[in-house]
Structures are given as structure tokens and as C-alpha cells.
């Protein structure tokens, strides 16, 4: 939740802190990106990112630090969804960051409250004591607003709470969350002559909240739309890759025709 730059005083802040924060974040994110080239990398978007203290008003440099991590190949996540405290929860600053990077990098959600041990009923949202489903609903609503690609249900009792207290929300995310790509229209001729040219038209939609992160540097647009001419034995005799189709641009259920 915080980063210490002084071994003698882990919460120390001085005139060099902001410079050192940026240098350290740039170094560590580039180091990970250098060695983890095939899997997505993720960093928390937090109002005091990389700071010696873990709460308070948003640091004016935090937004640029998030952008720095993203430029080095990172996705973003928050582990404070459902918390509405303006000092350390998921509030105006975090929502603005999510809106800024929506459909550009994946956003991952984790709830802030452990309902079995945290006093979630003191939250400004007015969650009722003894009603963990209120917390789950708050987390879900913030996730929908942020258009998250993934919801982290944690482990143990937290996972059980999602399935026992708010299973309908789990079902909704399964059907609505992340990316949901499908061709809602494909036009091909029913007969073709050998050696002739064939025109294929397709229309695609993403029915999910999120987007398909084909643009991540670790994936580098490797997922493509392709059409194949298949013989009677189901063997592809010819494959055509449509280079004009880019699934990372398909968002908000809009039709994309090619």
C-alpha cells in the first residue's frame, strides 16, 4: 500500500520524493516488461501511487505515474472497488482514471472490503450491517461504470460471499462483463466456381462491458479474424486473414462491418 524510500523512516517525504518515485516506478515497470513479454502486466491505479503514505488526497503526480506504467506496457487495476471513503477508497479520482483509460488498457476490479472482518457498514454508501450483498452490489455497480475486463473475487470467504450472497451478480458478469465478441452477420456466396474470386462480408459486435485487449504490447495484435475454405474432410485448403478487422476497437455493442 506504500513505498519506503528511507530505510530509517519508512514514511519520510522530502524534496526528492517525487523525483525518486518516478525513477523507481520507471525502473521497476521496465524491468518486469523486459522479462515478462508474453503475459499482461498490471499495476494499481491509486491516488498516492508509489508514495510513502497510502491514503490522503490525490497526489498531483499520481496520474502521470499511471500513464508512465501504461506506456511501459501495463494494464491497470484497483483493489478498492466498493469503498467510498474519499481518503483511501474508490472515489472521484479513481473513477476519472478508469474513464481516461477505458478501452485503451484492460481494467481489473477487486473489492476493497473483506465482509467477514471489515466494518463495511460505516462506508458512506450506507451498506447495512449484516448485509454483505449490499457491498457486492456496490462493487458490481462501480465495476460496470469502469467497464472492467475482469472481476477478482479473491479467495476463501470472499469468493463464497459472491456466490452465496450475490450469485445473480456473478451470473450478470458472466453474461455482460469482459469482452463478448461475435459475428452477427456473415455474407458469403452459396456457390463459387473454381479459380474465381469470392467476396466475404462480415459484421462484428462486442456485447461485453470491456474490450478485447489485442493492442497490449505482450500480444501485439496477434489475434486476427480469418476465413477458411474447408474441404469435405474438414481440412482447411485456403485461409484468408482479414487484416482490416481489429477486434480491440470493437466496443459498446456497436456494429463493425468489413
Q: Model-predicted segments: where are they?
A:
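Structural beta-strand segments of beta-rich domains
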Residues: 196-200
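Catalytic cores of secreted or luminal carbohydrate-active enzymes
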Residues: 136-191
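Short coil-to-beta strand junction motifs in C2/discoidin
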Residues: 212-226
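Residue-level recognition of well-ordered beta-strand positions that form the cores
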Residues: 201-205, 226-228
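A beta-strand/beta-hairpin structural motif
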Residues: 237-258
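Catalytic-core regions of glycoside hydrolase
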Residues: 4-157
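Short, acidic/polar linear motifs in exposed loop/turn regions
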Residues: 206-210, 233
Amino acid at each position: 500500500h506504500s513505498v519506503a524510500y528511507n530505510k530509517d523512516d519508512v514514511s519520510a517525504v522530502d524534496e526528492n520524493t517525487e523525483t525518486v518515485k518516478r525513477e523507481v516506478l520507471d525502473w521497476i515497470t521496465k524491468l518486469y516488461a523486459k522479462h515478462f513479454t508474453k503475459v499482461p502486466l498490471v499495476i494499481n491505479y491509486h491516488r498516492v501511487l508509489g508514495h510513502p503514505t497510502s491514503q490522503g488526497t490525490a497526489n498531483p503526480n499520481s496520474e502521470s505515474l499511471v500513464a508512465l506504467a501504461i506506456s511501459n506496457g501495463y494494464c491497470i487495476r484497483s483493489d478498492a472497488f466498493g469503498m467510498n471513503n474519499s481518503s483511501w477508497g474508490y472515489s472521484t479520482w479513481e473513477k476519472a482514471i478508469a474513464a481516461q483509460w477505458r478501452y485503451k488498457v484492460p481494467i481489473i476490479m477487486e473489492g476493497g472490503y473483506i465482509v467477514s472482518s471489515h466494518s463495511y457498514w460505516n462506508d458512506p454508501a450506507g451498506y447495512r450491517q449484516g448485509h454483505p450483498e449490499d457491498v457486492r452490489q456496490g462493487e458490481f455497480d462501480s465495476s460496470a461504470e469502469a467497464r472492467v475486463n475482469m472481476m477478482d473475487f479473491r479467495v476463501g470467504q470472499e469468493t463464497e460471499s459472491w456466490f452465496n450472497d450475490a450469485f445473480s451478480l456473478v451470473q450478470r458478469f458472466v453474461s455482460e462483463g469482459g469482452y463478448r465478441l461475435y459475428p452477427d452477420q456473415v455474407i458469403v456466396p452459396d456457390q463459387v466456381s473454381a479459380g474465381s474470386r469470392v467476396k466475404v462480408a462480415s459484421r462484428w459486435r462486442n456485447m461485453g462491458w470491456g474490450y478485447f485487449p489485442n493492442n497490449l504490447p505482450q500480444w501485439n495484435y496477434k489475434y486476427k479474424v480469418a476465413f477458411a475454405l474447408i474441404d469435405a474432410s474438414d481440412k482447411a485448403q485456403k485461409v484468408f486473414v482479414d487484416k482490416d478487422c481489429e477486434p480491440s476497437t470493437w466496443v459498446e455493442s456497436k456494429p463493425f462491418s468489413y
